[in-house]
């Protein structure tokens, strides 16, 4: 039995488990069996089988990766993210599952050697290729299982991630599946028309369109592209007809229809008959009559409806698909040449791993989604005796969310606990004495009472300070005494079962979590966390063989109280704080925010003039190696200043002039002048984020 290839059957020794580290008995036993290469006569029925590749220190800490997953990685990681034996996070190649995972901390180290500092947005091309593959293959499998007579054509909505390296790879990876693109503006249409998509792929044009937009879409047919112009209004139809006749190019049309079903989730407003886009039932009938009158009814080949983004509930999806199918049947009865049923977006991502209908989760699998869609469409078409249409979906989030992660360092932490003992001194205020004495009387039975008393005494002492009746050093001792009580209460709570805590006690102690100050901008890199309370899994990238000993919230580097994260994905759901490790001043502590590939890059803003981060795309390879495919440097200070109408060259000239005056008026030396100007110039060239020396 050797190394990673060694497997052993573990049997339970009933008489000696109490001697082993808590939570590690099975792992420790396996270690002993491996080293001795023998099985004691005490052992009975085989119960567990697993690889033995764990380092020796792993069995001495009392905290075992295999027995404990603080962050719920096994639930939300989807096989892409896992914990390595050294306690680091590893990235697993879903295209080659037998490959050794890539150590994410090692990726950061190699990037830094190239001069690429964190924060960095890391894209993994394997993850993107795999998602496109499994979405298309899941639909094809469902079509075979149901006996559906049509086919599937997916399209990627460019708005979900417009970045060139992303769209280009989607076009490449989607080519075997005739995977197309969806656009909602002229700029996005120009992107789509430049991509090498499969000739069978669809280019679907949504959004409001002027004559130039329509002209581009019509002319693209001369390139052999299947471009469908989806009508958003009756007025738009008249413009399409006018431009089409001017060019002498017949249009290929779709119609966007508002359905009455309203779904749950953050984006429920995009569904229902009060949604912003699409035609009402009455307007659809009007459009059909206009097309009939203009002899263009055969041009109407696609019906589009949009359910919304990140729809968590499968029942709602089925109802939506049923309604869309019935409408398709009725429009076809009016004489339209409908061939494509575009069901829009909605396929969600399980950010929390809860498999629930909460906004950040989904209560269905990809396979269930595809099967339910195909089955529902097929049933309705069969019932009406209508030929099965080609099913189209615009599953942007499900394509790209998992493929990107934000990696950043923790700069420092602020703790609200004190380990130091505060002793009463002669002449101390009685309230301070009472606060200090609470530590001696603390027990598991009076935790909430003691917290109430400590808070009362501290608040009264603060009031005395405000009235000038207490000195600053005495108030500082009171604050330390209060923090010590909090620390003692938290330690006692860790030894108790959750059932022994009161909810109030838990909330109040969590509300006093540490603050970990991190090198990123929430507004630039994770805007949905600020805007709609979106959850992204956030975990340490190292030290996962150690038990976290701190509870924390995260703050970014912006000077804004909203630049904080205080809801986190953990093993048992969602928590108000994140378990983390105490910082080591001799070692960088990195965190990763996962599944950030959908919408975040373009929605990010320049709050405090923190610009785009460095962006790197890698390819996971064999033997735990990776290949650097693309690197895009983050914004420099100079670039960000130019975005807000400053001319960096002019700024430098003005600063030089001011520095010259300083030499004349304040006696600054020429050497100091030179250093000032040099520092200013270098700062203009620098990264907008905190840079390590």
List where the protein language model places each region:
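N-terminal, intrinsically disordered charge-dense segments
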Residues: 1-21, 50-53
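Short, positively charged low-complexity motifs
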Residues: 12-16, 25-27, 40
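Conserved, well-structured core domains of diverse proteins
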Residues: 62-117, 619, 627, 637-640, ...
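Charged (often Lys/Glu-rich) extended helix/loop segments that serve as interaction or gating elements
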Residues: 70, 378-693
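Low-complexity, highly charged intrinsically disordered N-terminal segments
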Residues: 84-162
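Short, glycine-/Ser/Thr-/acidic-enriched flexible segments
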Residues: 88, 96, 127, 161-163, ...
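Active-site-proximal beta-alpha core segment in soluble small-molecule metabolic enzymes
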Residues: 147-342, 347-352, 363-368, 376
């Amino acid at each position: 039995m050797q190394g990673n290839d060694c497997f052993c059957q573990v049997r339970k020794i009933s008489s000696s488990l109490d001697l082993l580290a808590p939570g590690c008995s099975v792992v420790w036993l396996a270690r002993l069996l491996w080293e001795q290469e023998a099985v004691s006569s005490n052992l009975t029925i085989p119960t567990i089988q697993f690889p033995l590749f764990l380092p020796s220190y792993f069995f001495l800490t009392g905290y075992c990766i295999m027995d404990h997953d603080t962050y719920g990685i096994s639930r939300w990681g989807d096989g892409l993210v896992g914990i390595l034996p050294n306690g680091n996070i590893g990235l697993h190649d879903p295209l080659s599952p037998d490959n050794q995972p890539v150590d994410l901390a090692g990726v950061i180290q190699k990037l830094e050697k190239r001069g690429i500092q964190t924060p960095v947005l890391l894209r993994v091309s394997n993850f993107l290729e795999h998602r496109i593959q499994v979405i298309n293959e899941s639909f094809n499998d469902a079509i075979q299982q149901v006996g559906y007579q049509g086919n599937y054509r997916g399209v990627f909505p460019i708005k979900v991630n417009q970045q060139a390296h992303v769209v280009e790879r989607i076009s490449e990876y989607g080519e075997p599946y005739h995977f197309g693109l969806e656009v909602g503006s002229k700029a996005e249409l120009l992107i789509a028309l430049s991509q090498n998509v499969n000739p069978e792929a669809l280019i679907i044009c949504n959004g409001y369109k002027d004559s130039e937009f329509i002209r581009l879409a019509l002319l693209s047919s001369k390139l052999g592209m299947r471009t469908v112009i989806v009508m958003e209004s009756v007025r738009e139809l008249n413009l399409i007809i006018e431009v089409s006749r001017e060019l002498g190019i017949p249009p290929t049309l779709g119609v966007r229809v508002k359905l009455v079903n309203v779904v749950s989730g953050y984006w429920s407003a995009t569904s229902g008959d009060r949604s912003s886009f699409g035609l009402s039932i009455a307007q659809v009938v009007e459009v059909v009559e206009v097309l009939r009158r203009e002899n263009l009814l055969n041009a109407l080949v696609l019906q589009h409806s949009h359910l919304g983004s990140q729809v968590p509930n499968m029942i709602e999806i089925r109802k939506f698909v049923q309604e869309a199918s019935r409408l398709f049947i009725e429009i076809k009865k009016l004489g339209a040449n409908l061939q494509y049923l575009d069901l829009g977006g909605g396929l969600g991502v399980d950010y929390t791993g809860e498999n629930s209908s909460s906004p950040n989760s989904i209560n269905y699998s990809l396979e269930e989604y595809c099967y339910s869609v195909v089955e529902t469409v097929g049933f309705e078409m069969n019932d009406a005796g209508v030929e099965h249409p080609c099913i189209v979906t615009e599953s942007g989030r499900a394509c790209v969310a998992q493929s990107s992660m934000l990696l950043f360092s923790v700069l420092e932490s602020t703790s609200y606990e004190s380990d130091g003992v505060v002793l009463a001194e002669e002449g101390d205020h009685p309230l301070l004495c009472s606060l200090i004495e609470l530590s001696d009387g603390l027990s598991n039975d009076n935790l909430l009472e003691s917290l109430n008393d400590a808070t009362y005494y501290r608040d009264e002492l603060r009031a005395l300070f405000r009235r000038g009746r207490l000195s600053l050093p005495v108030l500082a001792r009171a604050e330390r005494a209060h923090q010590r009580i909090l620390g003692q209460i938290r330690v006692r709570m860790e030894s108790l079962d959750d059932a022994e805590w009161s909810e109030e006690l838990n909330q109040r102690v969590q509300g006093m979590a540490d603050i970990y100050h991190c090198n990123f901008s929430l507004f630039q890199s994770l805007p949905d966390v600020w805007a709609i309370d979106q959850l992204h899994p956030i975990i340490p990238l190292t030290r996962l063989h150690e038990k976290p000993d701190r509870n924390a919230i995260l703050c970014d580097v912006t000077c804004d109280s909203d630049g904080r994260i205080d809801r986190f994905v953990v093993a048992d759901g969602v928590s108000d704080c994140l378990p983390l490790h105490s910082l080591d001043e001799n070692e960088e502590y990195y965190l990763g925010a996962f599944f950030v590939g959908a919408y975040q890059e373009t929605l990010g803003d320049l709050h405090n003039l923190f610009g785009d981060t460095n962006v790197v795309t890698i390819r996971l390879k064999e033997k735990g190696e990776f290949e650097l495919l693309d690197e895009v440097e983050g914004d420099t200070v100079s670039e960000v200043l130019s975005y807000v109408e400053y001319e960096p060259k002019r700024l430098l000239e003005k600063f030089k002039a001011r520095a010259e005056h300083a030499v004349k008026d304040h006696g600054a030396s020429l050497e100091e002048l030179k250093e000032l100007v040099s520092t200013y110039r270098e700062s203009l060239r620098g990264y907008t984020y905190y840079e390590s020396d």
